[in-house]
């Protein structure tokens, strides 16, 4: 009957599967018109999530030298999915084997026109700029060998940037006082930014311009009568203040109107000038 032939034709037509946008399209063309059997490992490899739409993923920004404090990229220029959409391999790049999140995402609005500002083009201050894309073909096992000199240059540039502006050492006063006490009125006040060291003691008696700073140091003024009395007292004690002369020194300072350390510094400064003139 014609009806039997019509029924046989309906039974031979394979059912058309309905696939969503998250699943791979069915494969046809096999014997019998059915779909290809799925391998056991593919059943659990599908993920539920949005597709790669909404923008393109450009160059890989993963730093492969972060462990040694450097910066080295693999040179991958654009993300290329390693598997079909909807699988776990779709999130892995077939070129650099990195996750899709390491690639710079370019939105659809900027896909037609180049982005005016790219985070990958930012070079740290003091670092040596390096080529973003490798001129050589990258092999899966040796892509880091070409960037070793970039890693060394980046590490050297980072060290130079950190130590390129060395801080000036703190100025410390000289430890050799040469007989001068602390708080000397004649020693002068030296600014914190001036070079203070073993030569700071040579500024005594050198005049107002002897100090390394621009500030004029304080100098005690003596009258001629005070100079004559201090000269006579210095000759009497031998140009040195000893312990058994403390009472006489204190009495002399009260009479003349000078401090003890001022008298001591004056004797030290004039011992080699006024003392040598004596017969």
Curated annotation (Swiss-Prot):
Residues 215-278 bind DNA. GO terms for molecular function: DNA-binding transcription factor activity; transcription cis-regulatory region binding; zinc ion binding. Residues 1-13 have a biased composition (Acidic residues). Keywords: DNA-binding, Homeobox, Metal-binding, Nucleus, Transcription, Transcription regulation, Zinc, Zinc-finger. SUPFAM superfamilies: Homeodomain-like (SSF46689). PROSITE patterns: ZF_HD_DIMER (PS51523). It holds the Pfam family ZF-HD_dimer. GO terms for biological process: regulation of DNA-templated transcription. Gene3D superfamilies: Homeodomain-like. A zinc finger (ZF-HD dimerization-type) spans 57-106. It is found in: Nucleus. Residues 1-47, 168-190 are annotated as: Disordered. Its main location: nucleus. GO terms for cellular component: nucleus. InterPro entries: Homeodomain-like_sf (IPR009057), Homeodomain_ZF_HD (IPR006455), ZF_HD_homeobox_Cys/His_dimer (IPR006456). The record marks 267 as: Required for DNA-binding. The keyword Repressor does not apply. Putative transcription factor. The homeodomain differs form the typical one by having namely 4 instead of 3 extra amino acids inserted in the loop between helix 1 and helix 2. This is Zinc-finger homeodomain protein 1. It comes from Oryza sativa subsp. japonica.
